[in-house]
Amino acid sequence: MFSRLSLFRRAALAPAPMRMSFRTIYQKTEDELPRRIVPKLATFYSANPNHEDRINRLERLLRKYIKLPSQNNNEAQQTKAPWISFDEYALIGGGTKLKPTQYTQLLYMLNKLHNIDPQLTNDEITSELSQYYKKSSMLSNNIKIKTLDEFGRSIAVGKRKSSTAKVFVVRGTGEILVNGRQLNDYFLKMKDRESIMYPLQVIESVGKYNIFATTSGGGPTGQAESIMHAIAKALVVFNPLLKSRLHKAGVLTRDYRHVERKKPGKKKARKMPTWVKR
């Protein structure tokens, strides 16, 4: 009985064990455990990390520049980009993990970014797309964006039939000179004067630009339409957003029609002499 009481007394009088805080325990375990390796890519745990990371970057660009105007179907076909093939992309996009559907997804997003109006693209889009061009076409694929010269002028060249025109367009009061002469003095026909003014009427800017044109070759109609073509191209430099409106009006596309040549045995290109029985 006494031995039991003595044991209880000793246990009661013994000092309590020291309690360690959570911070002390955590510091000890943190020092003992090895450092955790952080994945380089945020898509590390996906089936194809390299491809998914590139898709994420392209999606980020599309969301950022989704409001920029795009080219129409005809212009997109003319400026179709030569992208790298499936085998070439597999070297940087996951190797054997890459699937044809993933490559198709990549091409769709690349074409969406490439079809943005070239006048509005920037270095961020260009540098991202340059990774996917074929090496042989990297140098020839640089798009030169026209800008105003040091005097604030937009310079463009237009052609029609055998006529060629070079125009200088600057913001002003609406003065138009052709080969150093007034428009009414150089073109006597009302139709020729109207064709020159047509691009300005399309964008509702009559009287807002001064135009100085030099033209040579062909007749009055060919010279007037070559000046019209050059003015339309020069106006796009001032405001690239006008390109779609001028293209719909048909003044940005060169008219390649020519007078058909005369054939032997005929009076003109198609006209035959009157047939007489005898």
UniProtKB/Swiss-Prot annotation:
The keyword Ribonucleoprotein applies. Belongs to the universal ribosomal protein uS9 family. GO terms for molecular function: RNA binding; structural constituent of ribosome. InterPro entries: Ribosomal_Su5_D2-typ_SF (IPR020568), Ribosomal_uS9 (IPR000754), Ribosomal_uS9_bac/plastid (IPR023035), Ribosomal_uS9_CS (IPR020574), Ribsml_uS5_D2-typ_fold_subgr (IPR014721). Residues 1-10 form a transit peptide. Its main location: mitochondrion. Component of the mitochondrial small ribosomal subunit (mt-SSU). Mature yeast 74S mitochondrial ribosomes consist of a small (37S) and a large (54S) subunit. The 37S small subunit contains a 15S ribosomal RNA (15S mt-rRNA) and 34 different proteins. The 54S large subunit contains a 21S rRNA (21S mt-rRNA) and 46 different proteins. This is Small ribosomal subunit protein uS9m. Component of the mitochondrial ribosome (mitoribosome), a dedicated translation machinery responsible for the synthesis of mitochondrial genome-encoded proteins, including at least some of the essential transmembrane subunits of the mitochondrial respiratory chain. The mitoribosomes are attached to the mitochondrial inner membrane and translation products are cotranslationally integrated into the membrane. Gene3D superfamilies: 3.30.230.10. It comes from the Eukaryota. Residues 259-278 are annotated as: Disordered. It is found in: Mitochondrion. Disulfide bonds: none annotated. GO terms for cellular component: mitochondrial inner membrane; mitochondrial small ribosomal subunit; mitochondrion. It comes from Saccharomyces cerevisiae (strain ATCC 204508 / S288c). The gene is MRPS9. Keywords: Mitochondrion, Ribonucleoprotein, Ribosomal protein, Transit peptide. GO terms for biological process: mitochondrial translation. Pfam families: Ribosomal_S9.
